[in-house]
Amino acid sequence: TPLEKLVQRKISRYFFEQRKRQLRKLEEGLGKTVTRELAVETMLLDLEEENILLKKVVWPLYLEIGQEAGKSLLVELGADPEIFTLVDTPAIAALEDKLIKVVGINETVREQLRDTLIEGMGQMETTAELMERVKQVYNFAQSRSLTIARTETGQAAGLARDAAMGQMQVVKHRWVTAGDEHVRVSHQELNGMVVERGQLFPNGCRFPCDPGGPAGEVINCRCVAAPL
């Protein structure tokens, strides 16, 4: 979807800029007379600062995705999409909770950087070799940008659609898959299943892409809940 592609571009750009910051800090820190493990810690980017930057990137995206998804749901119901608002809905609180958890992306990258740099310094690698290790970590992070974008977009949209259903007093909804060969087996089995809104589907999700659902049922999900 266009919004998914927008999120992917933003996340990919964030990783690109973060890589530049990390390479610069690594280059500046190499050569200091400290223990190897301590040297690595001092040459990694400040996690708190990076988390602030990441949140600034994703929060406007969450709001845009949520607003568009909520309006789309109202159109499906034949209602005026302009009456939808995220303000004072459970979706806003849930999106704020997502904002707290999204920093896990940075924590994963930082741990990978720490491990690979300790290994490289233990092998007395050159500056060029250590910097290549950093690039490899970010190459992997970049390769995950579509998965991250799809998951973040789906979760923000799922929350907003659920909020819109609440606004329109929808009682039941149906699980609808993307209908192609990439749909996971557990979701193929759920396709067409109807439950009361707020109750769990058999896979532990309140709705497709539910941030509170099991990770294995949410990551890369493209399903939606259709109101009845």
Predicted regions and their residues:
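N-terminal leader/targeting and assembly helices and adjacent pre-domain segments
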Residues: T1-N139, L228
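Acidic, glycine-rich two-metal-ion catalytic cores of nucleic acid-processing enzymes
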Residues: F140, R144-L228
